[in-house]
Swiss-Prot record:
Domain (Peptidase A2): residue spans on this chain: 609-690
Span(s) of short sequence motif Nuclear/nucleolar localization signal: 524-527
GO biological process, any: viral translational frameshifting
Zn-finger (CCHC-type) residues: 507-524, 533-550
Positions of the record's site feature: Involved in capsid protein dimerization upon acidification: 418, 430
Residue positions of motif PPXY motif: 172-175
Gene: gag
Site annotation Cleavage: residues: 155-156, 166-167, 177-178, 239-240, 476-477, 479-480, 488-489, 577-578
Motif (Nuclear export signal): 219-229
Pfam families reported for this sequence: Gag_p24, Retro_M, RVP, zf-CCHC
Keyword Metal-binding set for record: yes
Protein name stated in the entry: Gag polyprotein
Length: 701
């Protein structure tokens, strides 16, 4: 094969130039053609009659497997062979120019029967015949200056006409001193001794025939035999079906690879890219029906396996239909032998049932390729049916979710859907514009029109987020990480100190101002008919905050004693700690972040709301529209809120809530811990308990 590769490579370099294939590519192509049965020997490639079948077979293989490397190499080789043929560069002339010419030799004499076969070996690529003129020119006597052809002069006496020698009609013995037979050791030794070979010995080695006698058989071409043995040896590839010296053989799959694939399917699922990559790698080489069915039975459950069997049968029926229309289909063995059928492809024919060795021996290479490709396509269909992807239209970016995480969920859902590949990118970009947070939507709206792919949109948003101010999710994450140690310290201190029933930390009492209990548990609470109650504004007795005469002067602040429900004492004297421009002149609205500090698992740990600063409300009330549905609440001691419109049912948060006010520049005020009330009101209200805890006073600055 090496000699054929060298000849073809030289021709390709001559006629193809820089695009000529390498010797490695030519050797791989020749090995494939021999394996498919398209060439009995590499030298058969010189025959123009084999060119069209080779082109058809490689084209069909490229369409089935999607691999066009061998087809491209064959196209270059075919062009070189056709160019050489058009220039009428025959094989005899090429061998003559390269010094590789040979000739027929009669059967050896008795003296040569005992010689080893290596002495009779000839180089690969030699022709068994040669023209009479060339042969006689080589066998001219050494003392003659000009070669003499047979029929014009006698070999012994040199007479041109009228020779009566008995050997006049016989051709001379072959010239054994040429370099055409480098392995003939006996001839080389005789030449090394410096003596001419006797004519008798020459005749005994290769006795010439007489006139009219048929030429003897050629010597065995051991170079060609060596090529045949090398071509039938096991290839250096990892295939379940290998070709050995004694014929095709079946080798089992690696158990570790199957175990790892089964674990990947169980942990990652059928639609995972890792699973698909491992399945494609394991089925990259032809598999027997025995291996295919057992592999799918291991990695698939009962229901997916039943779906796969049906899908595999449909794919095999497609192969059979194509093979029926084309007699030279690869599954039909290029027209040699019987046509393929469903029983053969499923391994149910005679001699194949439950017998992998029989399947390896009886199935053609084209059938093995079709079986494996159909099984892989059926597996892809089952993966889409057994594990459908979630609806991409319902995916939205959460309040505290980063844009990258949102993009990951969206792209995974879109790629797992049934959308055509050409429509996936526009759908992803449209979801970025509609399903992301408002600040991200604003960035995407201001993006240049040249950004047309999801990757460009993601990169643009990430670059802008690096230079833009903190977003809501960034503020929530930063505040949560900074306040969490302080929250735990406060909770631990309250547990170690003053606790009420149930072990829950208590704030300040609204009646007596003492810590450790609520107003409902206050021992000094006003009895029915008792007019001695404490004012929450001036700390006086006998009246309440609504009746206090100092209400207009201090806006409900008590001099000398803070009423914060959190761990921070109230400022003395009260001062403005929050300076901001309200969104409305007549209604002081602020942006607030609420963080649940409890251990109860919730979907969203932080939410953003808009609340009204109301110094006339005793407590902070969160509207049920703003309150997350999965945040736990409990019944309050006072089940109603009394206002101008009457009583409103009220509940209370079971977990401690961290409340922070966000300024216009994105900065945060000092957070506050409290248990807010939850009621069906039109908007959330920050009452006096929150204002006092923040040290806030509303004025007309």
């Amino acid at each position: 094969m090496e000699a054929v590769i060298k000849v073809i490579s030289s021709a390709c370099k001559t006629y193809c130039g820089k695009t000529s294939p390498s010797k490695k590519e030519i050797g791989a192509m020749l090995s494939l053609l021999q394996k498919e049965g398209l060439l009995m020997s590499p030298s058969d490639l010189y025959s123009p009659g084999s060119w069209d079948p080779i082109t058809a077979a490689l084209s069909q293989r490229a369409m089935i497997l999607g691999k066009s490397g061998e087809l491209k190499t064959w196209g270059l080789v075919l062009g070189a062979l056709k160019a050489a043929r058009e220039e009428q560069v025959t094989s005899e002339q090429a061998k003559f120019w390269l010094g590789l010419g040979g000739g027929r030799v009669s059967p050896p004499g008795p003296e040569c029967i005992e010689k080893p076969a290596t002495e009779r070996r000839i180089d690969k690529g030699e022709e068994v015949g040669e023209t009479t003129v060339q042969r006689d020119a080589k066998m001219a006597p050494e003392e003659t200056a000009t070669p003499k052809t047979v029929g014009t002069s006698c070999y012994h006496c040199g007479t041109a006409i009228g020779c009566n020698c008995a050997t006049a009609s016989a051709p001379p013995p072959p010239y054994v001193g040429s370099g055409l037979y480098p392995s003939l050791a006996g001839v080389g030794e005789q030449q090394g001794q410096g003596g001419d070979t006797p004519p008798g010995a020459e005749q005994s080695r290769a006795e010439p025939g007489h006139a009219g006698q048929a030429p003897g058989p050629a010597l065995t071409d051991w170079a060609r035999v060596r090529e045949e043995l090398a071509s039938t040896g096991p290839p250096v590839v990892a295939m379940p079906v290998v070709i050995k010296t004694e014929g095709p053989a079946w080798t089992p799959l690696e158990p570790k690879l199957i175990t790892r694939l089964a674990d990947t399917v169980r942990t990652k699922g059928l639609r995972s890219p890792i699973t698909m990559a491992e399945v494609e790698a394991l089925m990259s080489s032809p598999l027997l029906p025995h291996d295919v069915t057992n592999l799918m039975r291991v990695i698939l459950g009962p229901a997916p396996y039943a779906l796969w069997m049906d899908a595999w049968g449909v794919q095999l029926q497609t192969v059979i239909a194509a093979a029926t229309r084309d007699p030279r289909h690869p599954a039909n063995g290029q027209g040699r032998g019987e046509r393929t059928n469903l029983n053969r492809l499923k391994g149910l024919a005679d001699g194949m049932v439950g017998n992998p060795q029989g399947q390896a021996a009886l199935l053609r290479p084209g059938e093995l390729v079709a079986i494996t490709a159909s099984a892989l396509q059926a597996f892809r269909e089952v993966a889409r049916l057994a594990e459908p992807a979630g609806p991409w239209a319902d995916i939205m970016q959460g309040p505290s979710e980063s844009f990258v995480d949102f993009a990951n969920r969206l792209i995974k859902a879109v790629e797992g859907s049934d959308l055509p590949p050409s429509a996936r990118a526009p759908v992803i970009i449209d979801c970025f514009r509609q399903k992301s947070q408002p600040d991200i939507q604003q960035l995407i709206r201001t993006a240049p029109s040249t950004l047309t792919t999801p990757g460009e949109i993601i990169k643009y948003v990430l670059d802008r987020q690096k230079t833009a101010p903190l977003t809501d999710q960034g503020i929530a994450a930063a505040m949560s990480s900074a306040i969490q140690p302080l929250i735990m310290a406060v909770v631990n201190r309250e547990r170690d100190g003053q606790t009420g029933s149930g072990g829950r930390a208590r704030g300040l009492c609204y009646t007596c101002g003492s810590p450790g209990h609520y107003q409902a548990q206050c021992p000094k609470k006003r009895k029915s008919g008792n007019s001695r109650e404490r004012c929450q504004l001036c700390n006086g007795m006998g009246h309440n905050a609504k009746q206090c005469r100092k209400r207009d002067g201090n806006q409900g602040q008590r001099p000398g004693k803070g009423l914060s429900s959190g761990p921070w004492p109230g400022p003395e004297p009260p001062a403005v700690s929050l300076a901001m421009t309200m969104e409305h002149k007549d209604r002081p609205l602020v942006r607030v972040i609420l963080t649940n500090t409890g251990s109860h698992p919730v979907k969203q740990r932080s939410v953003y709301i808009t609340a009204l600063l109301d110094s006339g409300a005793d407590i902070t009330i969160i509207s049920e529209e703003d309150w997350p549905t999965d945040w736990p609440v409990m019944e309050a001691a006072n089940p109603q809120i009394h206002g101008i419109g009457g009583g409103i049912p009220m509940r209370k948060s079971r977990d401690m809530i961290e409340l922070g006010v966000i300024n216009r520049d994105g900065s945060l005020e000092r957070p506050l811990l409290l248990f807010p009330a939850v009621a069906m009101v039109r908007g959330s209200i920050l009452g006096r308990d929150c204002l006092q805890g923040l040290g806030l006073r509303l004025t007309n600055l």
